[in-house]
């Protein structure tokens, strides 16, 4: 059965590019870019992933991405992921990326997206892995910042399939970003939002994502199982979780 599953062609519809950065690569880029890390070894980074809650996970997630500085860094991050995906016979991917996590550190939006999309093109040609990119907004940043980054993305709309929403959900409900997502839909982009597991007001947030934002997909959303009417609405709309 393991061999059968390994040989199956696959699609990956939920992967955070920055989250695919491997510990050894973190240290390699930190040394190259002169970035000081709070971890003294790749093994310490791995140990930090023994987290208890979403904020603890996000702490290590953002610490890792700080080593990404140049266009080549983003290229290597992305292409190395595609190499691993190809080894698992993944044929199509819709990866997320978090531009605010980089522009807030002084890395230009163009640097980020050019490195990622160059790797996408090479992976399609060399590895047979096709992909379309989803730009995520960080929900613990302001709606104004999200709108600014949507405007930054306007020259690159042909490189995106959609927009998403991730990061810490506490006090950051989906409707905080309703206007941003409405604008993205006007521009022809698909919509998805994270509704992580067992977060504050999770079920009501999923209702808002489904019926008010009218997203095309819900990331995670497993707490919908607590509400039969919500499950029925998701089925009626044909949404993927």
Q: Where in the sequence are the language-model features?
A:
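Metal-cofactor-binding active-site regions of metalloenzymes
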Residues: 1-191, 198-204, 210-219, 223-240
